[in-house]
Amino acid sequence: MAAHKREIQQDIRELGELLGEVLKEQASQQAFERVESCRRTAIEYRSGERDSRDSLVADLEGLSPHHQRVVSRAFTTYFELINLAEERERVRTIRTDSHEGTLADSLETAADELGEADVETVQRILDDVLIEPTFTAHPTEARRKTVKAKLRDISTSLETLDERLLTEKEEEQVWRDIDAEVTSLWQTPQVRNRQPEPEDEARNVQWYLENTLFDVVGEVYDELDDAIDAEVPADIEIPKLFEFRSWAGSDRDGNPYVTPEVTATTLERQRSVILEKYREQLKRLSGVLSQDGSRIDPGSAFQAALERDRERLPGSARTAQERYPDEPYRQKLKLMRERLDRVGDVRPGGYDDVDELLSDLEGIAHSLRDNGAESVVEGHVDPIRRQVATFGFSLASLDLRDHQQKHTDAIAEALERAGIDYTSLSEDERVELLTDAVLQDQPVIDLAETDDLSEDSARVLELFDSLADWQTEYGVEAIDTYAISMTEEPSHVLEVLFLADQAGVVSLPEHSGIDIVPLLETEYALSGARRIMGTLFENEAYSQALEARGQTQEIMLGYSDSNKENGFLAANWSLYKNQRRLGEICDDHDVTMRLFHGRGGSISRGGGPMNEALLALPNSTVTGQVKFTEQGEAIAEKYGNPRIAERNIEQMLNAQLRARKQAIDQPEEAVREEWLEAMEQMADAARQEYRDLLESEGFVRYFEQATPITVIEDLNLGSRPASRSGERTVEDLRAIPWVFSWTQSRCILPGWYALAAGIDAYLEGEEPRSSESSSGNETREDGGSIEMLQEMYDKWPFFRTTLDNAALSLSRTDLEIAEQYANIADPDLRDRFFQRITAEYERALELITEVGQRDELHARDWLGENLEHRNPYVDPLNVLQVHLLEQAHRTDIEERTLRLTVKGIAAGMKNTG
């Protein structure tokens, strides 16, 4: 028997050896030897033999284009396999820690903390909490769907190897299966030859919801049930705690390919998928609920519900009675499956909404409890009921999104027919016009009349015209949110309210079928958040719409664009302090705030450990409801493996429960005024340094020459263009390719640059430019103290999380590799910018370790601990990429190799944008 315990080193060794054999078979012995030579030389270089770098460069540049492609493919495939081995190790660690009772951030630890409160407070916390992960189609996933499917098969085989009772023959067969998959993977194109369509992106998101999260959510609820029961000495009702949402197939911002037809197809496919999942669940439940009607009393309420179904579906009822003559629960379940079949069908008798299905499940549960079958309810009925409450009839509710300028232009063109020059109106005049139009009974524009409009404006009106039909067909909850990119004025929100009103989606004061979500992503918008939201809350039309939506306002914060505009430290501070301001304005108007965090996968775009981010939010903003984006490769990493998905969901719930309790116990967190002043000072100086870099003459050319941005723009990662207008400026470039490019060059500038400038400004006593007492950057006689920064790090979760995230970016930065990219650039640009970046990096290293009082930069990060192992395998890909970028004219095979190096480096860094 193969009863040994596998370890990651064994997995890495055996997978590496297997890849070597595949390389010999599929390429040649010579190719294998060239790859091995590059690997050994890279290891020697990382071991301190500095001359080895020149040898590595010479070896790779001396290869033929064919062998360069083989080397690139070999290292890329290696990382794909090693990432699977690391995933398996994560699962093993989770299982071991769980078994030993040492699992951090578990539901048990959250329940233990909740147990300190009285029963009413515990129930309040649970009732307040709603977590809404929102899957987006943002193009940061560099792998093809076909490649991901093969990797999942290999992952399944690795999981099988962890079983203790495999015979030697069984283990040999598993390795033969892995060999076959790796061979197939080698022979499969690694890079997309076409741009994915929005339907592809929607199907990708759907896969994780259908195949992982549908089952995982039920398991998390079960764990929470057990944990609460153990700590709280009273009956506690566990409400709906999760709601999954998606932008895939409905996010139109900058993507002309997301049409009403795409959105309609996505809605229909998602409903079909979830209804089939429920039918399967009810069929399995029917295998359990075989109770004899002569031995139990189902109860009058159950019998009445069954009789109503018989009247709705007489033909199906006769079939059910003939098949299950003495089994009332099976009869009921058979008719419930038939009603699911008829949802959205022309045939009568289907469920009108998900509440009817929930009512049927609760009726069965009540009947079973009355007959002493509580264990059957807990083990079989409650899990289905919670799945239905979580996923509804839509699998994931869709959010619509578009740029505010599109709405402004569409309204201006439509109103021009009535002789109204909307573009000439002031902001106050626009607010007045839109408010009056919403409050009056008669429509102002005809959404169906689009012949004389521009293409973009016609698309906007067609969308709102379709929205009412979608809500009628699929239910309001299937598509009930509209996010507005680049919101900077109250009129930008009222424009969407106006269009929704003209479509009949809103009919005030009684009904509003849509949450309108301002996306605040520029410094102007963030600093003006109080002005924007205050105007809206006091507006007659908007306040009625808000009341019709339960007096809850969702506000989205854009981490990506604010970071690109202001730099890492200034963006984080602006988001933090403006969240506090938003919390205050919502409290002043008795509005429940739900913050929507537009976070990317990388630190530079708001990424980092989600549980730590939730606990670092200002207490005054933690209402219990929270929403955040899940993007690109982060979706696969977090939700591809069921056990890891469960762990991520568990950590989110742990953090949100604890954060809500903390907010109730202490509505205002204990943050000293001098800390806030220090942060203002640091952020202001950091922003000045960052903007000075970006606005320096020649910087955009340096960025173009010292990163692979031109390659990334052509990679077919997503269905939308890399820049909003097609131009190459830092302002217009989307945040994802901006971050992706710096990550590829190993500089990772957006994740840490100007942090040191900010901290040094505080230590040297430089007054912030925003200070009322200062007309410019002046120096005070008394500088700041490193001791206070250390105290802030120890006692202020926001500051600690910010520095820890910067440390994570710094730990992944490699300026020796980045220098090779800089050397491609014009020598004058290189000398000006790379030296400046290097000086800031070195000072940041000193300050991070001093403030955090630690010897190592980021010892707590699991990936950071493995960088030493990974670097020798990423280095050859970087060297090869630099060599190919230097070529003025590349052959077709060199272009394909260059694109493959991008994919390989992304796999090696476990990060794109």
Give a label for each model feature.
Residues 1-427, 456, 831, 835, ...:
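Often metal-dependent polyanion-binding catalytic scaffolds in large enzymes
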Residues 2-6, 13, 24, 50-74, ...:
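Acidic, glycine-enriched catalytic cores built around paired aspartates
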Residues 18, 22, 38-41, 74, ...:
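Generic, well-ordered alpha-helical scaffold segments in large soluble proteins
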Residues 119, 123, 129-154, 174-190, ...:
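Structured alpha-helical segments in the cores of large, soluble enzyme domains
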Residues 203-204, 212-245, 250-253, 462-480, ...:
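Secondary-structure-rich domain cores
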Residues 239-241, 245-247, 255, 385-386, ...:
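Beta-sheet entry/capping signal
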Residues 258-289, 502-688, 889:
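Catalytic or ion-translocation cores adjacent to nucleophile or general acid/base/metal-coordination motifs
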Residues 400-404, 481-489, 515-523, 599-602:
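Conserved short loop/turn motifs at secondary-structure junctions
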